[in-house]
């Protein structure tokens, strides 16, 4: 199995560290391998985003650009990435449907709920299949669908 590429977008250092600790625990307990990137604001991930991630773990309330706005912009470029919101703001839960978020977790984040949603996310990534590959470009990496390759 290949590594699952996860991006954590969280502006609170303690919350970010908890998510990273949970990801490490999940890897150890379930034999998974993750490649994890971290951004501390929605604007930063939108600015640098290329469709190479499998799962986005997004906070909503952040200073420059909130996670919901970031998710909308990311969806314009990547319709495959699995989005999970992790936030203290329950009032935005319905808005998550606009960006086809898989789930919405509330802080304080309990391990069991996190692990269950992460399992669902990984299952969705694998179920959707990955008929793509990462290639290096002049601007970094991008995901190329194998069906789009006409000639080598």
What is each of the regions a protein language model found here?
Residues 10-12, 88:
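Acidic di-acidic motifs
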Residues 47, 53-127:
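CheY-like receiver
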Residues 1-7:
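Non-catalytic signal-transmission and effector/linker regions of two-component phosphorelay proteins
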Residues 113-152:
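Conserved binding/recognition cores within well-folded domains
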Residues 35-55:
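Acidic, metal-coordinating helix/loop segments flanking the phosphotransfer/catalytic sites
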């Amino acid at each position: 199995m290949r590594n699952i590429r996860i991006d954590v977008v969280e502006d609170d250092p303690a919350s970010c560290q908890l998510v990273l600790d949970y990801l490490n625990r999940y890897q150890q307990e379930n034999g998974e391998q993750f490649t994890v990137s971290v951004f501390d604001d929605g604007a930063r991930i939108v600015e640098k985003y290329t469709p190479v991630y499998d799962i986005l773990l997004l906070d909503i309330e952040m200073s420059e650009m909130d996670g919901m706005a970031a998710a909308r912009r990311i969806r314009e470029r990547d319709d495959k990435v699995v989005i999970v919101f992790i936030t203290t703001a329950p009032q935005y839960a319905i808005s998550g449907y606009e960006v086809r978020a898989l789930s919405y977790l509330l802080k304080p984040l309990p391990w069991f709920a996190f692990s269950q949603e992460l399992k669902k996310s990984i299952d969705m990534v694998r179920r959707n299949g990955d008929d793509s590959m990462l290639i290096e470009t002049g601007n970094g990496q991008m995901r190329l669908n194998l069906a789009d390759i006409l000639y080598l």
